[in-house]
Amino acid sequence: NLAPSLNHYVAGLVDAELGDALLNSLKLAATTAVFGTVVVFVGAYLLEKTRGLDWARSLVRLMAMLPMAVPGLVLGLGYIFFFNAPGNPLHFLYQTMPLLVLCTVMHYYTTGHMTLVTALKSIDGEFEAVSASLKVPFYRTLFRVTLPMCLPALLDVSRYFFVAAMTTVSAVVFLYSPDTRLGAVAILNLDEAGDMAAAAAMAVMIAAVSGVATVLYQAAGWWLARKTQAWRKR
């Protein structure tokens, strides 16, 4: 019977408890989008817009590029060995949502870092020099000049983190618990159990959520461009 039907969606959400898995994915994606964007921006800002500790900058840049060279499976296994050690004071984070967020941010850190570094490099460094000469606090320049000029890049990074967190499997597959099972992981579990229909339904729901989120980000970007980026068209 190849007739279109919603039976597999209903059965998956109710019988296979895919609703909880999808909700966990949304929590992970939303938290990663906010926390990841903040962390990446702070790291990029400290590298590009501050002075001092020149000896450490090359090391920090290397560490920022390193996640791109580490496979997700290796990253997930590393987190298991580190956080699962009983003597580790951070052991309480194991199999919790904060650890999934941390792992996802680190997994996709490099792309966001490169995007924001490029955006910050495009801003004339004289802004900071003039602010310092006029004794204007750096945070005022940050909030009045730097952040507004970086808004499009910040939205792009946030959208990237959201979609990546919705679809990630490789690293988090080792770190979830029954209470933090994600939608993408549920697809693998259903496929292994032979329930292809429910797995396909879950995949469609994840794709739909990612598509809706992308449209919302585009709308937010259009609105913010009208309100804060009109100077670019002058």
Task: Label the model's feature ranges.
Residues N1-L18, M166-W223:
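Interhelical loop and adjacent transmembrane-helix boundary motif
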Residues N1-N24, P86, L90, Y94, ...:
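N-terminal, non-cleaved signal-anchor transmembrane helix
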Residues A3, A11, G19, R51-V60, ...:
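Membrane-interfacial helix termini and adjacent extracytoplasmic/periplasmic loops
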Residues A16-K49:
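Transmembrane alpha-helix signature in integral membrane proteins
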Residues G43-Y79, E128, R232-K233:
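Cytoplasmic-entry segments and transmembrane alpha-helices of multi-pass inner-membrane transporters
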Residues Y45-G52, V117-R144, P152, R159-Y160, ...:
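C-terminal transmembrane helix and the adjacent membrane-cytosol boundary/short C-terminal tail
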